[in-house]
């Protein structure tokens, strides 16, 4: 025989759990607000604390939250910020304090942070709120926002190191209740402050936390632009031009940018500039050909012509190229802020010319090579060596003979295998031809 056992809950405990003390809470708030207005703030707070205890012990979360928030509100409205800090700590540490009540007083106090003009009092309130919210998951979002505010204050004061230290340790990616958009905003701010503090490695690690699929959503277009601007700043530090071009390409593919013609064309200009500044590679060549086919490029014909010069297998004379493009390129930010931009562009022109020469020449004298490149013998040899090291071209330079060779030396085994394959193909063709001739003889009965 099975006997059903029910939890031993006393009627007194059950009644306590089911109590609704909202009428008592409302009445207490109203009466003690009037009492506080008459100048008896301390007495009003004591009365409210008694009511708060009654509601807390009855586990009436809404009423407890309302009373606790009312206490903080009365202290602030009376201009007693010292009492605000004191009662925040008191209420958060009361025995068996309900989570909703702690969350209510933290959220109520956060409203006052923006309203307080005295910086010392503001910092004291932020410090109190961060202390009582430390280690409490149910107010982790509020703590993160307070930390961000504190970091901004330090940044405005010029203390970049402290601002970065405060903000960079936030692990908002683990916050389950924080919205994706707010998380990305935190990541972007963390990246920015880390780069302001010259901590580019940490900025990269934070940037990798951002989910690109979330950025692609329509409601996050502004965040997508802000994020890639920070990534551009990061890659600019190491002059990684191809990655900068890819970042601008991501901005270019944003619907809000596509609708804004001036911004679209300016972004396209940046893409063109950074593509031609990028070192020669398969990725660079692919990107250059893709960008060249963009329809809006016809509205900025000089940039299309610029890409075409690097797309066409013809030599580019640096002096003519420089005079033709200097006025336009000097107006762009990269050539104003990046001291090595023109030198890097000159290197790209030289690399392009070497690739053109390697296409049309199997062998060329080093003197003629230097003449075509407008370089000295040593400079031309260095550039050729760099391209060979990068596996962009194949070349050998015979210094005593003064000859540069751009054709690869075939491996004897590969040559022998190719010859054997060709002979096999030839014999197969002879055999097939013989069969066809014999068939014609038979069809026409020719002996």
UniProtKB/Swiss-Prot annotation:
Give start-end ranges for the coiled-coil region(s). none
Say which family it is in.
Belongs to the proteasome subunit p55 family.
All copies of the PCI domain together span 240-411
Its function, per the record, reads: Acts as a regulatory subunit of the 26S proteasome which is involved in the ATP-dependent degradation of ubiquitinated proteins.
Record's keyword annotation contains Lipid biosynthesis: no
Instruction: Please identify the protein, giving its name as recorded.
Output: 26S proteasome non-ATPase regulatory subunit 12
Question: Per its UniProt record, what InterPro entries does this chain match?
Answer: PCI_dom, PSMD12-CSN4-like_N, PSMD12/CSN4, RPN5_C, WH-like_DNA-bd_sf, WH_DNA-bd_sf
Name the PROSITE patterns on file: PCI
Q: Which Gene Ontology cellular-component terms appear in the entry?
A: cytoplasm; proteasome regulatory particle, lid subcomplex
The secretion signal range is: none
Ordered alphabetically, the record's keywords are: Proteasome
Residue ranges, annotated region (Disordered): 1-23
State the organism of origin: Dictyostelium discoideum
PANTHER family annotated for this entry? 26S PROTEASOME NON-ATPASE REGULATORY SUBUNIT 12, 26S PROTEASOME NON-ATPASE REGULATORY SUBUNIT 12/COP9 SIGNALOSOME COMPLEX SUBUNIT 4
Q: Which gene encodes it?
A: psmD12
